[in-house]
Amino acid sequence: MGQPWAAGSTDGAPAQLPLVLTALWAAAVGLELAYVLVLGPGPPPLGPLARALQLALAAFQLLNLLGNVGLFLRSDPSIRGVMLAGRGLGQGWAYCYQCQSQVPPRSGHCSACRVCILRRDHHCRLLGRCVGFGNYRPFLCLLLHAAGVLLHVSVLLGPALSALLRAHTPLHMAALLLLPWLMLLTGRVSLAQFALAFVTDTCVAGALLCGAGLLFHGMLLLRGQTTWEWARGQHSYDLGPCHNLQAALGPRWALVWLWPFLASPLPGDGITFQTTADVGHTAS
């Protein structure tokens, strides 16, 4: 029987719109960061050594961020191309009527991707793709380096934004921080002032969001859970922090955070998973 997801495509304009908007916002943040590091506007000005160190840190963060984004988008966590027929169906297997296929435990069907995802966690709206077995590692590293980049930009833009705000009344300051678009459209700020306020606002909010996401998924990582399993209170796959880290990040789990292209193959296949019950039977 043909698989409906084999012919389906999620590469249309609606599916790619979140990714395009995310890329445009990331480009704006990158340009603002380069502007601050190269020209050093606002007090206090960066010295040559400080500027060189900041540029090196920014390059390291951006390489890691872009590398993990590329790995995340290139990795397919779905059942496409995975040989499921002929495998022994055991406890936890289910039949997906949309995909017309048996699917293994921890899988879930995504209505946006129109296919079942191995070890499905959730659908990432900003990047337009599901987070699952095949791309969980770059997703976690992406959260870490995105939070770092956004925090870095916020700190660098802080002095310039502070100088801008001190030159105006408190009401003007509040309006610029809360309604920068309105201030631009009414002609009360220049385009450069709007860009400074808007990028700083979004960077602070983005850093908080990515930081919260990293803490949440770090907790799930140590517990060996997906978001769905956490919501349902399931702990069947929690084999201890060390085993859970290796299962999700590979044997070099402590180093994968430093470079996206570091080889650390996952020990599993996304289809069969060891449970706490299996460990108990083996020990007995």
Curated annotation (Swiss-Prot):
Gene name for this UniProt entry: ZDHHC24
PROSITE patterns per UniProt: DHHC
Keywords: Acyltransferase, Lipoprotein, Membrane, Palmitate, Transferase, Transmembrane, Transmembrane helix
Record-given protein name: Probable palmitoyltransferase ZDHHC24
Active site: 124
Membrane-side (Cytoplasmic) residue stretches: 1-18, 74-137, 188-201
Annotated EC: 2.3.1.225
Recorded topology in the membrane: Multi-pass membrane protein
Cellular component terms per the entry's GO annotation: endoplasmic reticulum; Golgi apparatus; membrane
Stretches that traverse the bilayer: 19-39, 53-73, 138-158, 167-187, 202-222
Any one GO molecular function term: protein-cysteine S-palmitoyltransferase activity
Catalytic activity: L-cysteinyl-[protein] + hexadecanoyl-CoA = S-hexadecanoyl-L-cysteinyl-[protein] + CoA
InterPro entries: Palmitoyltrfase_DHHC (IPR001594), PFA4/ZDH16/20/ERF2-like (IPR039859)
Function, in words: Probable palmitoyltransferase that could catalyze the addition of palmitate onto various protein substrates.
Pfam families: DHHC
Biological classification of the source: Eukaryota, Metazoa, Chordata, Craniata, Vertebrata
GO biological process: protein targeting to membrane
